[in-house]
Curated annotation (Swiss-Prot):
Native source organism of the sequence: Acanthamoeba polyphaga mimivirus
Disulphide-bonded residues: C86-C108, C90-C96, C161-C182
Pfam family, any one: PAN_1
Name listed for the protein in its UniProt record: Putative PAN domain-containing protein L775
SUPFAM superfamilies: Hairpin loop containing domain-like
Entry-listed glycosylation sites: N73, N95, N118, N155
Signal sequence interval, chain numbering: 1-24
InterPro entries per UniProt: Pan_app
Cross-referenced Gene3D superfamilies: Hepatocyte Growth Factor
Length: 203
């Protein structure tokens, strides 16, 4: 065999060895990947809740238009330009439970309940919209507003009195804890006058 033929044979053998090595490496890697453990899935980080939304500011007063609770005046203030001015005057006096305001004559009537032991006057606060989380009842302890009754109920709990108040579309009720007497109340209709109950909120 000539030297050239021997060289060709050697080259062919080398190529076969390289091809064989590549094929062997391919199958080795394939088998290794098939047997490799599956990496665990990283846990999903839960979304952290944001800070709680601050509640809507509750109103300090609840107003009923075209209504009056006559009498019970503790102070009459003239020349108050706006209802807000009247609200501020009521807020200055801890005994002021509600007020009537006459916007035409700019007169503010600050009101207080009649001191009566074991009797609570509770104003109904009809909140709507953004104020649905605010208080719906504003009690005035040991105080009464005689008159304005639309229904009287005996031998009831105060919770039952409250439900009767809602049923009869009341504006407030008086409840005597000794006699268990419940008096459902409503303002008088009076055009041009507003009645505004103090809710107990500080806004």
């Amino acid at each position: 065999m000539s030297g050239k033929a021997i060289f060709v044979v050697i080259i062919a053998i080398v190529l076969l060895l390289l091809i064989g090595s590549l094929i062997g490496f391919y199958f080795y890697e394939r088998r290794r990947r098939q047997n490799a453990p599956v990496s665990p899935v990283s846990p999903v980080t839960p979304v952290q809740p944001g800070p709680p939304v601050s509640p809507t500011t509750c109103p300090a007063y609840y107003t009923i238009d075209s209504s009056d609770i006559s009498g019970f005046n503790m102070s009459t203030i003239n020349n108050l330009a706006t209802q807000d001015d009247c609200s501020q005057e009521c807020s200055k006096n801890p005994n002021c439970s509600w007020y009537n305001y006459d916007p035409n004559n700019k007169v503010c009537y600050l009101k207080k309940t009649v001191a009566t032991p074991n009797t609570t006057t509770t104003f109904r606060i009809r909140n709507t919209g953004n104020y649905d989380k605010c208080t719906q009842w504003a009690p005035s302890i040991n105080g009464d507003i005689p008159g304005f009754d639309i229904k009287d109920i005996n031998n009831n709990t105060e919770d039952e009195c409250k439900q009767e108040c809602i049923q009869y579309d009341c504006d407030w009720y008086n409840y005597n804890s000794d006699s268990k007497a419940c008096y459902i109340k409503k303002t008088q209709k009076q055009n041009g006058i507003v009645t505004s109950f103090r809710t107990g909120s500080n806004s």
